[in-house]
Amino acid sequence: MIYQGETLTVSYLEDGIAELRFDAPGSVNKLDRATLLSLSEAIAALQQERELKGLILTSGKDAFIVGADITEFLELFDLPQADLLGWLKKANDIFSAIEDLPVPTLSAIKGHALGGGCETILSTDFRLADTSAKIGLPETKLGIMPGFGGTVRLPRVIGADNALEWITTGKDYRADDALKVGAIDAVVAPDALQSAAVQMIKDAVKGKLDWQGRRAAKKAPLRLSKLEAMMSFTTAAGMVAAVAGKHYPAPMTAVKTVEAAAGMSRDEALAVEAQGFIKLAKTDVAKALVGIFLNDQHIKALAKKAAKQAAKATSHAAVLGAGIMGGGIAYQSASKGIPAVMKDINEKALALGMGEATKLLNGQLEKGRIDGIKMGQVLSAITPTLSYDNVKHVDVVVEAVVENPKVKAAVLGEVEGIIGEDAVLASNTSTIPISLLAKELKRPQNFCGMHFFNPVHRMPLVEIIRGEQTSDETINRVVAYAAAMGKSPVVVNDCPGFFVNRVLFPYFFGFNKLVADGADFAAVDKVMEKEFGWPMGPAYLLDVVGIDTGHHAGDVMAQGFPARMSKEGRTAIDVMYEVNRFGQKNGKGFYAYEQDKKGKPKKVADAASYELLAPIAKPKQDFDKDAIIARMMIPMINEVVLCLEEGIVATPAEADIALVYGLGFPPFRGGVFRYLDTIGLDRYVAMADQYADLGPLYRVSDKLREMAAQGKTFY
């Protein structure tokens, strides 16, 4: 044994060839501070080995290295700049030391080698992968960029154009795709990885493979003429500007970093990379995106805990109500290996539901994500039926019929009498209180809400709603089922609108008030999209959701919270609803809709909307972007804070994930609580106080005011 640490070991395999094996306690290898320290000690030990002829890096896990330890990031980002630079320098000295060993080096890769894991394999002379390997540099998705030499070595291995695509998109690549661009040198079957790695390093030792030439190219400036460099970096910058936009600086900083370091040797280039990394690490965007990742991990941990505590796992499910939503839920369940019965009273609805599942599977097939066999397996795992016979023995029933309390109550009561006594019932409702639907049930403890978002296959959030009598066992089983479906379940307590819709409608009330005060709805949309960062502004979102749906939900919210959400006369939403302008579904809402070349609805301005709104609005007035953002966001933020104070949602982390995953809250802002921490509670309270005369939705809670006075934060 040359070296033994807690997360890695080094020992000889045969004839002077050493193996450095990453094998941390736990399920995955990460490049945390402890592992980097061990790696430094291991390389120092190898430098003293006179018998050393070659080195192979391997993993004792299913994945090579999944990346750095992101739980350490926020603490690192808060370090003084000089300390952060020192940490980066120490880490990069380790990878440079691997690259400078006087013997050939090789990485034998299985599973994921991402982020720091990818940068580790780039430090070796050769990269051999098995068919399970996936490699990539996802750092820009976290608001940062590679900091362990990724922007230096990858362009010199696969060329600037390919490297810029890898780094700026943050995608991971399968072994065969990585082989095509030269990121890895060969792909073998998993059972051949070890023997092939030993043979390859032996060939390098014997001089059959030019490891020194490869190494020299990696440490030299990029081989690009001035014209090639100009074309490469200008094209990349243009594409990044169009895709990432102004709110996400990491991809553009990465492009500028690779460009600035193109003519430099390795050590000079690493210094440039470190400056780019530090610049990004100090941004609010990086903290927000890392925060989302950590919150997501928190949600996953809660779901794992629920699955362990549940007395029974879900092996069979049923969906009541087919159509697009029911078909989407059944597809999601079946595609993740949980067969689903899809029950409806209407043959056409069943056909529509199966059609939705088939369409989604065809999309997967066309993209090469599944093959025909997998498609057949998923479709055969969905059983469409007009009868309850196949529903009797399922573990979970998801009711997804029309959003009408009487219809839902009747269907729930009917199916409760058919299923087993320990089976769980869940209602996919967006507004109807769970405790109300539970009143007619014999086993209300086995009932909860399970609110999916549309389209089901794309929206990661599922709200799990706990009614007054819902048992912990029911919550645990439904949370575990949602997670098994590949969703992010957030448990909320019952109230009108639950969490997501409850906080969305104050935002729409803010919109109604702005339009009534003379704002142009299209100008409001533009500010909320381009400046604040929502995927859709409020008018466009209402058109997409359906103004009839929004109108109904708004009435429900007004009844549920009359002191804050009751209407003051006719609103912009009322006006559109009264003349049957329901949005995209019938071609006219706030905007008119035409079909684009792909047959998808495209919004266009419609003068008729302004004529219809004129009677309820003051004369046209221009509001600056700060006023629009404040008037739109304060009602939502205040309601989110109230939901936390009332225990509707348990933690800031769960609230922020629900907002990002369920509403499309701008990820670069991290969610309402991260946003409040970023701007400062004192500043927020002062801003909200300026608008307090607009009504109760604009008035901050006493508790928030107290937190602001004490200088507290949510995270």
From Swiss-Prot:
Annotated region described as Enoyl-CoA hydratase/isomerase, given as residue ranges: 1-189
Q: Which InterPro entries match?
A: 3-OHacyl-CoA_DH_CS (IPR006180), 3-OHacyl-CoA_DH_NAD-bd (IPR006176), 3HC_DH_C (IPR006108), 6-PGluconate_DH-like_C_sf (IPR008927), ClpP/crotonase-like_dom_sf (IPR029045), Enoyl-CoA_hydra/iso (IPR001753), FA_oxidation_alpha_subunit (IPR050136), FadB (IPR012799)
Biochemical pathway: Lipid metabolism; fatty acid beta-oxidation
Sequence positions that bind substrate: 296, 501, 661
Q: Which GO terms describe its cellular component?
A: fatty acid beta-oxidation multienzyme complex
Reaction(s) this enzyme catalyzes, per UniProt: a (3S)-3-hydroxyacyl-CoA + NAD(+) = a 3-oxoacyl-CoA + NADH + H(+); a (3S)-3-hydroxyacyl-CoA = a (2E)-enoyl-CoA + H2O; a 4-saturated-(3S)-3-hydroxyacyl-CoA = a (3E)-enoyl-CoA + H2O; (3S)-3-hydroxybutanoyl-CoA = (3R)-3-hydroxybutanoyl-CoA
Which residues bind NAD(+) per the record?
Answer: 325, 344, 401-403, 408, 430, 454
Which biological process terms from the Gene Ontology are attached to this UniProt entry? fatty acid beta-oxidation
Which residues are catalytic?
451
Q: Which GO terms describe its molecular function?
A: 3-hydroxybutyryl-CoA epimerase activity; delta(3)-delta(2)-enoyl-CoA isomerase activity; enoyl-CoA hydratase activity; long-chain-3-hydroxyacyl-CoA dehydrogenase activity; NAD+ binding
What are the UniProt keywords, alphabetically? Fatty acid metabolism, Isomerase, Lipid degradation, Lipid metabolism, Lyase, Multifunctional enzyme, NAD, Oxidoreductase
What superkingdom heads the lineage?
Bacteria
Q: What is its EC number?
A: 4.2.1.17, 5.1.2.3, 5.3.3.8, 1.1.1.35
The region called 3-hydroxyacyl-CoA dehydrogenase is annotated at 311-715
State how it assembles. Heterotetramer of two alpha chains (FadB) and two beta chains (FadA).
Which family would the database say this protein is a member of? In the N-terminal section; belongs to the enoyl-CoA hydratase/isomerase family. In the C-terminal section; belongs to the 3-hydroxyacyl-CoA dehydrogenase family.
Q: What does this protein do?
A: Involved in the aerobic and anaerobic degradation of long-chain fatty acids via beta-oxidation cycle. Catalyzes the formation of 3-oxoacyl-CoA from enoyl-CoA via L-3-hydroxyacyl-CoA. It can also use D-3-hydroxyacyl-CoA and cis-3-enoyl-CoA as substrate.
What protein does this entry describe?
Fatty acid oxidation complex subunit alpha
Name the species this protein comes from: Aeromonas hydrophila subsp. hydrophila (strain ATCC 7966 / DSM 30187 / BCRC 13018 / CCUG 14551 / JCM 1027 / KCTC 2358 / NCIMB 9240 / NCTC 8049)
Q: What is the lineage of its organism?
A: Bacteria, Pseudomonadati, Pseudomonadota, Gammaproteobacteria, Aeromonadales
